[in-house]
Amino acid sequence: MDFLFYIFSSLTLISGSLVIQARNPVHSVLFLVLVFFNAAGLLVLLGLDFFALIFLVVYVGAIAVLFLFVVMMLNIRITEISEKRLRYLPVGGVLGVLFLFEICILIDNDCIPLLSYDIENTALLANYNQLSFIDWRMYLSTSHTIDALGSLLYTYYFYFFLVASLILLVAMIGAIVLTMQKGIRIKRQQVFLQNTRDFAKTIRKVA
């Protein structure tokens, strides 16, 4: 298990670095697809098989393929990419150093201060004992990821699920309305009039 984790994580880091180092944009998109596959493998190792499947379907099946088609359709010159890369290299280096510094601070310190806070002799202890917790381990041990996700969506977050469905419905109806608008000066074929007219009057023989 640990061996597979090290393989997937190392391949993810290597592929992610090759995304920005590849000179060909098509190769960059292919390395990005490899990053998504390795990340899905990490999710499978964590027991989140449904999220790994969604990750592959959404990112690899839709977004990465869209990137690949856009890159292949556009005529991107490699010289322009190399010039822009050298132009933004100092800014990217500074941001990378700052991000690495923040990660080192988070590793050295406790990420969740309340876990290391002593509440035994404070006024928070009474409020802490009155809180009601849900033991999700009991549900996860007897169900799969899809069951747990469905239970959460349709019990605790069904309002948000309905709102998201309504937003998608409004977006779909709006796209249909925008495409169905009839312009006055747009020339269209009148199929009914063409099929019902008398061909003897419309067709002329040229001697």
Curated annotation (Swiss-Prot):
Please state the Enzyme Commission number of this protein.
Answer: 7.1.1.2
Entry keyword set: Electron transport, Membrane, Mitochondrion, NAD, Respiratory chain, Translocase, Transmembrane, Transmembrane helix, Transport, Ubiquinone
The reaction(s) annotated as catalysed by this protein in its Swiss-Prot or TrEMBL entry are: a ubiquinone + NADH + 5 H(+)(in) = a ubiquinol + NAD(+) + 4 H(+)(out)
Q: How does it sit in the membrane?
A: Multi-pass membrane protein
Q: Which Pfam families match?
A: Oxidored_q3
Q: Extract the InterPro entries matched here.
A: NADH_UbQ/plastoQ_OxRdtase_su6, Nuo/plastoQ_OxRdtase_6_NuoJ
Which EC class heads this enzyme's classification?
translocase
TM segment ranges:
1-21, 28-48, 50-70, 88-108, 158-178
GO MF entries: NADH dehydrogenase (ubiquinone) activity
Q: Where in the cell is it found?
A: Mitochondrion membrane
Q: Does the keyword Electron transport apply?
A: yes
Gene Ontology CC annotations of this record: mitochondrial membrane
Q: Into which family does the record put it?
A: Belongs to the complex I subunit 6 family.
Function (record text): Core subunit of the mitochondrial membrane respiratory chain NADH dehydrogenase (Complex I) that is believed to belong to the minimal assembly required for catalysis. Complex I functions in the transfer of electrons from NADH to the respiratory chain. The immediate electron acceptor for the enzyme is believed to be ubiquinone.
Q: What is this protein called?
A: NADH-ubiquinone oxidoreductase chain 6
Q: Which organism is it from?
A: Prototheca wickerhamii
- UniProt gene name: ND6
